[in-house]
Amino acid sequence: MKTIGMKFKKLLFLLALTGFNLPLSAHCPADYLNESQEDFKERMQWFVDAKFGMFVHFGLYSSLGGVYNGKAVDGYAEWIQSTADIPSAEYAKLIDTWNPKNFNADEIVKLAKEAGMKYLVITTKHHEGFCLWDSQYTDFDIASSPVRGRDFIRELSTACKKYGIKFGTYYSIIDWHHPSQERNSNGKDSWGWWAQIAMRPGKKAEYVTYMKNQIKELIENYDTDILWFDADWVDWWTLEDGKDLYNYIRSLKPSIIINNRVAKRALFTKDFGTPEQEHPDEEQDHVWEACYTLNESWGYKMNDHKWKSAEDVLSKLNEINANGGNLLLNIGPDGTGTVPQESV
């Protein structure tokens, strides 16, 4: 035993001489949930200083514009599959006609830059499950659409670097297209506003692996600075699921910033809070960002003309910033990829 111990010490000595470092994380994985306050403040500083960002809602739903079978559908346009109760197989056919040939990442990011925005967040995968990037884990993505050969997430990531804008990616926890999930209604009623889509028995682990693989793509292939989650409300997604995902993401890119919807938002404050279409009227004890639409819908809705004035937007920005928050202001390009003039 003594001989083995001496040999081991000699091995460590030789490794040190050659500059070889044993990977500490292989034995003691970092718990990013318990980072020091000093490290947290340093990581979050650019975000706190940013004050103003652009949200972009874009997907297959953009081609419908809030209208299905010739009828205007109430509610947010990006929820039309739920509110119009469109069967998954029928909705998936939109990929064959979705042709946003006018989508111009450079112009969108330039618009953000000229407005004084410091970061941009794009819906890489909304609840519908369609992916705006070429993902190796699904065919329900841009590579299977009429604009195959383009990758809007890569185009936006590149443009953000060009203009000095931080790049963020929205990713929905639920997925109306993925086979692991099914509508939890009787087949006659709408899914309902919150779309409590059910997880099929025994399929959750498979879907979480799918999520992690796609998130890894967004980090490693597109160098996202922010991961902006949504749909944490479903029963099958737990606080512990969110904490595990948070640690996984930070292990891939320790400097990344993640919103509180990665877990149960009411119980989780890291890295920043996300009030929606409202904002607190006093300073908070945590980092926060309020997201607002320019009209009423997030995704493009052709019959939604209730646009906020420039004065309204400036007033909100000043109120939010005065209380230590950021404003994430949304635009929704139409089905051709064109940004409505009212948003400009």
Question: Where on the chain are the PLM-derived regions?
Answer:
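Mature catalytic domains of secreted/periplasmic carbohydrate-active enzymes
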Residues: 27-344
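Bacterial Sec-dependent N-terminal signal peptides
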Residues: 1-29
